[in-house]
Design a protein with these regions (language model features):
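Transmembrane helix interruption/hinge and helix-loop junction motifs
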Residues: 60-67, 117-124, 229-238
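Membrane-spanning helices that line or support transport/gating and their immediate boundary helices
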Residues: 30, 80, 84, 138-150
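Structural signal for membrane-spanning alpha-helices in multi-pass inner-membrane proteins
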Residues: 53-61, 111-115, 141, 228, ...
Length: 258
């Protein structure tokens, strides 16, 4: 067992998990180690993957579907760098956690709207796909946070974010308050809904985390890239609403039967 120190602190603490969406974390960890002493902040890394998402949405609208889907995979790796960098530097950030969620959501909406335009989706279908994807991400995040709690890993994220957190010494409480308010207004309903639908879960939550991790961005971006590579992006709604919907039901059922 690897000793958890400032240099090698793991996301899930002492628990070894099989997370399908975190295939890129070793790359992210190496990148974070390279950036540890560099004059770049965690927020700046988040800004990079946020801008990359918007760039991918523009590429989709311009017809560069394969290129944009490939960059969306790269975006997922960069998305993991900010968290790894915060862990290595031992400077967790509430602002960073909230901004990362907001940035991911804006990027998701931009990309899915771009797909909707190119693939000629109805506005209602685009809206449903965005909503379903957000809930699927929330389900994965729910069990990811529970697993971190079990393993005494990263404790920055919480199942219930309605209670305003105390700013870290290196953060501004005013800024934390602003981002916390934004998070509660737009995202707390997702957390509450997932918490109500899911049960206590199995003893070690490995089944729930592994299956729900296939709904996470890392795995979904790979699948979408494969759809683009095989020129089958027309089946994207079937993926989000069909296959992923079945996996959501499977995870929720397993979490209730224990």
């Amino acid at each position: 067992m690897v000793k958890i120190t400032s240099g090698n602190k793991k996301k899930y603490g002492t628990i070894d998990v099989f997370n399908l969406s975190e295939w890129g974390r070793p790359i992210a960890r190496i990148t974070a180690q390279f950036l540890e002493k560099k004059p770049i902040s965690v927020i700046q890394v988040t800004n990079i993957h946020f801008l990359l998402s918007l760039f991918c949405a523009w590429l989709i609208l311009e017809g560069y579907l394969l290129e944009s889907c490939f960059l969306l995979v790269i975006k997922g790796v960069i998305d993991a760098v900010d968290g790894e960098l915060a862990r290595i530097r031992e400077r967790p950030s509430h602002v960073g956690r909230y901004w990362d969620t907001v940035a991911d959501t804006i990027g998701l909406i931009a990309v899915m709207c771009a797909f909707g335009v190119v693939l000629d989706w109805e506005i209602a279908l685009t809206s449903i796909i965005i909503l379903a994807t957000l809930l699927q991400y929330s389900l994965f995040n729910h069990f990811s946070i529970l697993m971190r709690t079990l393993g005494s890993g990263d404790s920055t994220s919480r199942i219930d974010e309605r209670i305003r957190p105390i700013a870290q010494p290196w953060e501004s409480q005013t800024t934390v308050n602003i981002f916390h308010t934004i998070y509660v207004l737009f995202y707390s309903w997702q957390d509450s809904l997932v918490s109500k639908l899911s049960g206590k879960g199995s003893e070690k939550l490995r089944f729930e985390l592994t299956v729900s991790s296939s709904l996470g961005y890392g795995m979904q971006s790979i699948i979408i890239f494969l759809l683009a590579l095989t020129q089958n992006l027309i089946y994207l709604p079937h993926l989000v609403l069909g296959v992923n919907g079945f996996l959501v039901a499977l995870v929720l059922l397993r979490s209730r039967v224990g």
